[in-house]
Amino acid sequence: MKRLTVIVKGWPRLSETFVAQELVGLEALDLELDLWSLRHPTDTRRHALHLQLKARVRYLPEYLWQEPGRVARGIGAAFRLPGWRAAFAAFLRDWRRDPTPNRGRRFGQACVLAAEMDPATAHLYAHFIHTPGSVARYAAILRGLGWSASAHAKDIWTTPAWEKAEKLADMAWCTTCTAAGADHLNALVPGKTHLVYHGLDLSRWPAPAEARAPRDGTDAQDPVQIVSVGRLVAKKGYDDLIAALGRLDKNTAWRLVHIGGGPLKASLQAQAAAAGIADRIDWRGAQDQNHVRAALAAGDLFVLASRVAADGDRDGLPNVLMEAASQGLALVATDVAAIPEFVAEACGVLVPPGDPASLATALQSLIGDPTARARLGTAAQSRVQRDFPFARGREALYQLLHPCLSPPTPL
């Protein structure tokens, strides 16, 4: 079997555990991978999963001016490839509709990739159809290879329709991790996109060894532990969560543990201070998977207040919901994007997005009812175990990839 070249936007990324889980899982099925990243890492921590990847990891020039010699050699080599004329024509068509430095950078990166990728490469596979998809597409045309992609969330909802449609028509197949995303993409190019849930590798998420204490919010010395994990960006709705927490009964004992970094941290901390709840929130920043698992295991309740951002960005199906469910936590989340595909009535509470009052009502009710939390948490744990196993999604992806990498059967 030949090699698969995988293109990602950044590696490693703490917020994209689903990518690491998938690639390590594919290697376990004996696929030979080369990983190319458009960006260098910005996270100072890594998940254990990142260290388990055996593939070579290489970084394309993040900005073309940073490595002018390498870029010049890449363009020169790409110019001599049989696919140059077709690839450059595709780039020019895109440039006319998107004349941005970002578009030019992706073509330059594609030239470097096409020049430097392993000659044994049989197929290219991009995680996210926006910028990684552009690099994969141009490089595939240059080398005369097939390509495919996995679409997720922001890339689906913020990429122009013309670009998505042309990429889908050009690629062998696409996968996406939500039914909402699959419906949207298949409306553009029917039959090209497959629904493949990431699922959760439960061997990495064992259930907590000890039962939770029945905290009910009446003991200030032992408050109910609310946990939320997510980047501090608009689509995660943390301003709505803080507004909801500020509405809770002042005599209710609760504490929020938040894990994740992001550009809105200072404004959210100021909002919490203005609401008089700053001393109840533990902002832990970006953490590796071991710390996330420990926080979830120690928690009583998980909350995620996602919404659609002004630019159309939104969540897909956040993996952290499955991670919280694996730890037997009751879930409070918003009825937006693909969240309802996992959070059913029996295993959690859904509230309208952008509605702090409804969110506060749901939190107040569950903080004071440990029996309901236990019932919902048990149901959530059963749902992830039964309906979202990692092996199922990995096998579906393998069945798509394998024909792209295997030599044709002799007639």
Residue ranges and their predicted role:
Residues A115, A220-L232, Y238, I242-W283, ...:
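A conserved nucleotide-sugar
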Residues A180, G199:
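Carbohydrate-associated surface elements
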Residues R280, S358, S365, A372-D387, ...:
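A short, well-ordered alpha-helix in the C-terminal region of glycosyltransferases
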Residues A286-D288, A294-G299:
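Short alpha-helical donor nucleotide-sugar binding micro-motif in glycosyltransferases
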Residues A297-G312, L329:
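Acidic donor-binding loop of glycosyltransferase active sites
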Residues L321, S326, A330-A333, V343:
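Short hydrophobic beta-strand element within catalytic cores of glycosyltransferases
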Residues E345-P356, S365-T371:
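Conserved acidic donor-binding segment of nucleotide-sugar-dependent glycosyltransferases
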